UniProtKB/Swiss-Prot annotation:
Assigned GO CC terms: cytosol
Xref: SUPFAM superfamilies: Ribosome-binding factor A, RbfA (SSF89919)
Main location: cytoplasm
Superkingdom of origin: Bacteria
Keywords for the protein's UniProt record, in alphabetical order: Cytoplasm, Ribosome biogenesis
BP-aspect Gene Ontology terms: maturation of SSU-rRNA
Cited InterPro entries: KH_dom-like_a/b, RbfA, RbfA_dom_sf, Ribosome-bd_factorA_CS
Gene source species: Dictyoglomus thermophilum (strain ATCC 35947 / DSM 3960 / H-6-12)
Protein name: Ribosome-binding factor A
Subunit structure: Monomer. Binds 30S ribosomal subunits, but not 50S ribosomal subunits or 70S ribosomes.
Subcellular location, record wording: Cytoplasm
Amino acid sequence: MRQRQERLSALIREEISEILLRRVKDPRISSFLVITEVKMSKDLRYAHIYVSVYGSEEEKKQTMQGLESAKGFIRSELGKDLRIRFVPEIFFELDDSLEKGDRILRKLKELGLEDEQDSE
């Protein structure tokens, strides 16, 4: 079952990326959006989609509102594309791990620690 969860997660991640890129026309949704992870529930009925948005807090807020309002459309498009018996309910969640990682790298660079690791 775990393998099926992972396969479906990867497939949903690809499909939603494509849907957001080509079919969703909401101007609130930032073009600097990355789907970092999709976690499926054990029964495959729920998909938590973690997104990272590069931009200001206002842009992040607008993007999340746009995703929330497009959720029904995205789910219906998933149903057409995936041809699975039950299309999972989707939940978008903001993921700031990429931003945190970027901040850590900048701090290391300021301290001169990043260059030492690169030279090894």
